[in-house]
Curated annotation (Swiss-Prot):
InterPro entries: Glyco_trans_1 (IPR001296), GS/SS (IPR011835), Starch_synth_cat_dom (IPR013534). One of its GO terms (cellular component) is cytosol. The gene is glgA2. Keywords: Glycogen biosynthesis, Glycosyltransferase, Plasmid, Transferase. This is Glycogen synthase 2. GO terms for molecular function: alpha-1,4-glucan glucosyltransferase (ADP-glucose donor) activity; alpha-1,4-glucan glucosyltransferase (UDP-glucose donor) activity. Its EC number is 2.4.1.21. PANTHER family: ALPHA AMYLASE DOMAIN-CONTAINING PROTEIN, GRANULE-BOUND STARCH SYNTHASE 1, CHLOROPLASTIC/AMYLOPLASTIC.
Amino acid sequence: MRILAVTAEMFPFVKTGGLADATSALPQALERKGADVRTLLPLYRGLTPLVRGRKPVLVANILEQPVSVYYVVSDGHKLLLLEAASLFDRDGHPYGVKGEPFADNDLRFAVLSKVAAEIALGAIDGWQPDVVHVHDWHAALTCVYLADSTPSVASVLTLHNLAFQGQYPLERAGMLGLPSHLCTVDCLEYYDDMSFLKGGLTTASAVTTVSPTYAREILTPEMGMGMHGVLARRRGDLRGIVNGVDHDVWNPATDPYILANFTAATATRRSLNKYALLQALGLAPTQGPVFGVVSRLTWQKGIDLLPHVVPLIIERKGRLIVHGEGDTALEDSLQALAKRYPELVCAHIGYDERLAHMIQAGSDFIIQPSRFEPCGLTQLYALRYGALPIVSRTGGLAETIIDANDAAIEAGVATGFQFEPANEDDLRAALERAISAYNDRELFRRLQTQAMQANFSWDKSAAQYMALFESLVGNSTRETDAVADIRTETFAKIRADRRLAGTPGSPTG
């Protein structure tokens, strides 16, 4: 099976978060199952050496932008690198610079999506995909551009985070080559603007999220981010598939970023990594627990809860290490804590892959206090490295971590600690339970071993994706008649709801 993946970021080429890890590991897992996966990725400034001296496989003018596509195999990945210098050859990260998004992000990612659609329809000689797999709002317009194609092309939209929806002025739709009949509440229109994500949700052949729990949560008004109505009508095409861990990248036995490699059988060697981590960050050595946080520093991630539990951590002779970037106010509050407790708290603003690995290998616990979490990868890495996760009971966190309550401890299945989302008191109670377990060395070693033996391989997830792709391709040449019927029914229900509500562009429609 030939699969075209479309994404704005992919490790090790460009990464701002877990999306890059997922879009890197899944294609390789699918390849191991016999698929031919090629990933369309923008040629950002730092990637230009990859195409130097190569001939493009596609040259075109897309939305009045000259573009070239190069086929490159690098780091085990089959890449289709999209060169559009005026759009992607820039300073900053993929979406903006100095915390501000680029003003033309709608055009940038519309071009990415339009090129993906052209490739899906056979624009590259000798290779045409059976399925297009697009990730998040950046690539969601691919499904919209393919909506009227003949023959139809099967497409799957994976939601890594529903909070990001690609919302732009509707009057820019013409510039993006979007036909007027799709610029309505039936598809793209969203509160008189347009939402790339909503367009993808209504036109994709199937929709996936990165955990079954999150797939259920987003059907509710509380967690659906205004899209719960659209998602409810696609319920039959919506499923959750848990992300996995890339064992080639996240493997404590071979990790080149850490001082002392180890396995579950030699987990006592983690103490060497703990000492090295504290020393590298200028923190005082301790016999107490080290708590690590590797995260975007945002309200969604619950980072605002951390300052409230620092006194408890310090009182118990612990250390807190926070690594990430995000909201300026949260960054400032964490840096203020680090300044107040210079040998006890570290706030490392930014992202460094080596430090992320060191924190997993040297921390005793990893805290993830997210208010909502589609899947989460950090807690899966923590399991692999024996850093017991302390997570909020939501989304993929609830699904992948087994709370160390009395029953789970007795059954020998506990792998971490859970608490109620956005609940400071419950987080404090979870920390108390974790510290108590840490002080019981026999119990703590047992929990570490159970955590490290948890299996979240990408091969399991890839098998579910392959089954989905095969069902879409196998039920018809490209897209099943049933999917087309569901889409028509969805549009009709949306129109009916809009008339009843009397609200143009309702987000639930």
